[in-house]
Amino acid sequence: MATAETTQETPTAARTGQQFLDGLRGDAREIWLNGEKITHPLDHPQLAEAARTMARVFDLQHEHAGEMLAPSPDDGRLVNVTHLIPRSRGDLERRRRAIELTAAATAGMMGRTPDYLNVTFACFAGRADVWARRGNEQGAANVVAYQKEMRDRDLSTTHSIMNPQVDRSKPEAEQAAGEVALHKVGETENHITVRGARMLATLAPYADELTIYPGSDIRPQDGNYALAFAIPMGTPGLKFICRDSYSKQRSTFDYPLSSRFDEMDAVVIFDDVEVPKNRLFLCGDTEGYSEVISDTGWRGHIMHQAFTRAYVKLSFALGLGHLIANTTGVVRFDHIQEKLGQIWNMVELTRSGLVSAEAGSSLDEGGVWYPDDRPFLALRGEMPKWLPYVNELLQLIGGGGFMATPSVADIQGPLAEQIEKYYQAAGADAERRIRLFRLAWDYIGSDLGGRGELYERFYLSDSWRMTALAYKIADKAFAESLVEQFLQEQPS
C-alpha cells in the first residue's frame, strides 16, 4: 500500500469536511430528537457541533495525506487507507496510524468515526468467498461493489446490528409476535421489503448510509430475520429516533468534550422499507448469518480499529491524571503515583497488544492480511473493565477538586478577581486549573462521560462473555503439556 501527499493535481476520492457537510443535505432523512423532525444536523443547535467535528475528521485526511491516504487499487485516486483491503503487515501498520490520528482528534471519545465501518467492509469485501457460500454469489458481488462505492465516495456510514430488547429470554422471532425485530415481509423482482426496528445506530445524524449486518447468531427457522444490506439514510420509511443530546449548545470551556464529540445514538424504525436487490448482501441464509462474522476475520480487523482508539483514549486519560496530579501537587504521594502507574500499564499493554497483533499477522486463506487476534482476544475481555476503572482512578486522583469548577461566565464575571486568587493551584493559575478539572469531569462525570462508560462496557459485547470465549478458543496445548509431564512421571 503506497501512500502519497495530495497536491492540487493529485486526483483524490477522499472528501473534505465541506464536501461531507454538503453531502448530508442531499437527502430527505428523517431524524427525530425531542419530538422534533430534523433534516440536517447543522440546522439544529444540539447536533451542529458534532457535525463540524465530523467535518474536521474528513479534513484531517488531507492534512495528513502522507499517512492517511493511498492510491486506490482500481484507478490510482487517493483514498483513505482504512478503505483498503490489507495485503501486507505494512498495510496494517499504516491503517493503525490513520486510525490513531482520527482518534486523537476526538481524544478517543467518538467510537464510530467512519474508519470503523471502513475497516469492516474492507474485511467483508476481502473475504467475498465467505459471503458467496450456499449460492449467494450475487450477495457477495454486492458486498464487493458496495465496499468500492464506500471507498470511492468516501461515505460516512452507520450500522445497526442488534434488535430491540423486548424479552431477552426469547429469540427475536418470538418477541412481540415477531413484529418488532427487523425482518423481511415482502419481495419483488427488484427489491425486498423489510419491517421492524434495530438498535443502536451510532452516528446516525452524521451518516450518508445505513448498513445492516449480523450481530448475533440466529435460529435455522428464522430466515426472514437473517438480513444484511445497505441503504441511503434518506430511504423512504426509515426513521431514526435519537436519545437526548449531550451537546445542548454548551460552551467549549465548560464542556470541552460534550460540546463537540457527542456522536449520538438512535433506534432505527423500518416502516416497510424497500431494499434494492443490488444493495442486498444476505437474505434468509441463517448459516451465512453467523459465518460472515466468524469466518471473514471481522473480529480481528475490527478489534484492530477498536483497540487503536482505546489506546488513544487511555493515553488521554493518563494525560488527564498526570496533569491533575502535578497541578495540585499530589503527584508526590506514592498512592497517587500507583494510580497513575495503573493507567500507564493499561496504555502500554494496549499498545503492546496492537504491535504484537501486527508482528504476528499473516495472510489468510482469502488473501487478506490478518492481524494475530490472540492479543486482541485478551484485550477484549479486559478493556470493558479497564476503561470504567480508569474513571474511578481519575476520581480518586482529583477528589473534591472536580466540584470546585466555576463556569466561564463566573471567570469572566464580577467575581473574576476572587476566582483568580482562590482557585489557583500549586502548578497552574486559576483558569488553567479550572479548565483542566472541567475537561476531566466531562470525561468521567458528565452525561457524555456516563454514556462513554456504558459504551465501553458493551460495544464489543460484555466482558464476561468475551473472557469465557477467550478461554474456550485459546490454544491450551503448551500449558497442558507442562502439567502432563509431571502427571506422567513414573513414581520414584
Where are the regions that the model predicts?
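Short, charged, amphipathic alpha-helical segments
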Residues: 337-341, 369-377
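Alpha-helix capping/hinge segments and adjacent helical runs
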Residues: 374-492
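Glycine-rich flavin
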Residues: 70-209, 215-229, 234, 239
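Generic structural signal for well-ordered, non-transmembrane alpha-helical segments
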Residues: 48, 52, 148-151, 312-315, ...
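Extended amphipathic alpha-helical segments enriched in small hydrophobics
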Residues: 305-363
